[in-house]
């Protein structure tokens, strides 16, 4: 019997786990994940593109990639971009690894991190990212829990430090209170400017947008997504 609370290197199993993992997923987490994992104990690279075995021209970050569908879509359409994906939930990471096992050509274009995003953000060099995506994060809908939302001034400071000038932070959600919360915080941060000029800009999906499973669920339940884009000044 496989122990689902074992650890592989860093704290990985035994936390933020939903459905029981299949043996094939456990094998990939043990063998494939360590080859893609970003170890924060290592020295910070002077050039972030050196993290990838493929030659890439830029690096983008997606925080909370779920099952990885959007990341796979982006890698297909942007072959000269290296991607860093953060997903603390084990089941989502396992799904991503299964996809990478099937589409091995993307393994040299992606690095993964399975813990708190703030740790990785603090490790990254200044002005090293060409984009940050945060799509359908946990909305913490109860007002007393809003302080737990990922968007806050401290994390926006982190974004501002690692994003290059002129590059984009993209945020999508179907929860109106979180959209308004994000607009408020970004509008009051000196390093970010909202790109929208008219309502169409935040109601229209991003160029080459693939959607996510969370967005599909929102649409089925009658909630309209909002797509925000902020430029790093």
Curated annotation (Swiss-Prot):
Gene3D superfamilies: Vaccinia Virus protein VP39. The keyword S-adenosyl-L-methionine applies. Its EC number is 2.1.1.33. One of its GO terms (molecular function) is tRNA (guanine(46)-N7)-methyltransferase activity. Keywords: Methyltransferase, S-adenosyl-L-methionine, Transferase, tRNA processing. The active site is at 138. S-adenosyl-L-methionine binds at residues 62, 87, 116, 138. Substrate binds at residues 142, 174, 212-215. Pathway: tRNA modification; N(7)-methylguanine-tRNA biosynthesis. InterPro entries: SAM-dependent_MTases_sf (IPR029063), tRNA_(Gua-N-7)_MeTrfase_Trmb (IPR003358), tRNA_methyltr_TrmB_bact (IPR055361). GO terms for cellular component: tRNA methyltransferase complex. The keyword Methyltransferase applies. It holds the Pfam family Methyltransf_4. It catalyses: guanosine(46) in tRNA + S-adenosyl-L-methionine = N(7)-methylguanosine(46) in tRNA + S-adenosyl-L-homocysteine. Belongs to the class I-like SAM-binding methyltransferase superfamily. TrmB family. Catalyzes the formation of N(7)-methylguanine at position 46 (m7G46) in tRNA. This is tRNA (guanine-N(7)-)-methyltransferase. It comes from Bartonella henselae (strain ATCC 49882 / DSM 28221 / CCUG 30454 / Houston 1) (Rochalimaea henselae). The gene is trmB.
């Amino acid at each position: 019997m496989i122990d689902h609370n074992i650890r592989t290197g860093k704290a990985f199993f035994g936390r933020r786990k939903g459905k029981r993992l299949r043996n094939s997923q456990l094998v990939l987490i043990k063998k494939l994940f360590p080859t893609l994992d970003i170890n924060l104990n290592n020295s910070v690279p002077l050039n972030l593109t050196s993290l990838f075995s493929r030659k890439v021209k830029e690096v983008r970050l997606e925080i909370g990639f779920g099952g990885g569908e959007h990341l796979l879509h982006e890698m297909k359409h942007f072959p000269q971009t290296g991607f860093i994906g953060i997903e603390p939930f084990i089941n989502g990471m396992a799904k991503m690894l299964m996809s990478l096992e099937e589409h091995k050509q993307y393994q040299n274009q992606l690095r993964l991190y399975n813990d708190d995003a703030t740790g990785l953000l603090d490790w990254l060099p200044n002005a090293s990212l060409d984009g940050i995506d945060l799509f359908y994060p946990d909305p913490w809908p109860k007002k007393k829990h809003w302080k737990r939302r990922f968007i806050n001034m401290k994390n926006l400071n982190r974004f501002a430090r690692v994003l290059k000038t002129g590059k984009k932070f993209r945020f999508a959600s179907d929860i109106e209170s979180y959209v308004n919360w994000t607009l408020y915080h970004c509008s009051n941060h000196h390093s970010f400017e909202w790109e929208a000029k008219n309502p169409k800009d935040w109601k229209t999906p991003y160029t080459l947008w693939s959607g996510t499973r969370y967005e599909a669920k929102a649409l089925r339940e009658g909630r309209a997504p909002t797509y925000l884009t902020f430029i790093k000044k």
